[in-house]
Design a protein with these regions (language model features):
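Secreted/processed peptides and extracellular or luminal domains of membrane proteins
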Residues: 13-16, 35-38, 147
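Short Cys/His-rich Zn2+-coordinating modules
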Residues: 6-15, 82-84
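Accessory beta->alpha helical hairpin/"wing" motif in late/C-terminal subdomains of nucleic-acid enzymes
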Residues: 38, 148-170
Length: 171
């Protein structure tokens, strides 16, 4: 049975489902993707007590797993994720742009395909703490002529589409 809850990472609405024979629950969030919180009575406060910037990096990690079709990560004590937090905090601006291009390319079956990007929802894709960071990465991709703004969204340029295809092949 699913119920509406607040995501412990981004503090937005999410769906919570209990899984039989497992201690914990599964979360599906539009921003963070999907994850399993093990032993919530023990570990939930270790996440909610983290600074928002640290939770945003865990959100980027869970969204990354979701976007790359990996199994939803199991979150336990937030301390065990300290290496992941550091890894995501240290992503270069180039890494952020490449992940945005890959994200758009996966949604583009062909060159010139219109993709709706929502900074409020998609900011973890650029390893950003908030929608402002997403907009900065997107604007830079536009300046580099990898992405172009069109009337109802964004599309990859030929150069962006080629880069996105190359990144998809490396996955």
């Amino acid at each position: 049975m699913k119920e509406e809850v607040i995501c412990i990472l981004c503090e937005r609405n999410a769906e919570k489902a209990h899984i039989p024979d497992k201690v914990g629950y599964f979360i599906k969030c539009d921003i963070c993707g999907e994850y399993f919180l093990a032993s919530p009575e023990i570990f939930e406060s270790s996440y909610t007590d983290l600074p928002r910037e640290k939770r945003a990096m865990i959100s980027s990690y869970t969204r990354d797993c979701f976007e790359h079709s990996k199994e939803p990560p199991q979150l336990e004590d937030a301390g065990y994720l300290s290496g992941i937090i550091t890894e995501y905090e240290n992503k270069s601006f180039d890494d952020k742009i490449k992940n945005l291009i890959l994200f758009i390319r996966k949604k583009s079956p062909e060159l010139g395909y219109n993709v709706l990007l929502e900074a409020q929802k998609d900011y973890p894709v650029t390893y950003s703490v908030d929608p402002g960071g997403f907009k900065e990465v997107l604007n830079n991709a536009v300046e580099q002529r990898l992405v172009r703004s069109i009337e109802s969204g964004f599309e990859l340029t030929e150069q962006g589409y080629a880069l996105g295809t190359e990144l998809m092949e490396k996955e």
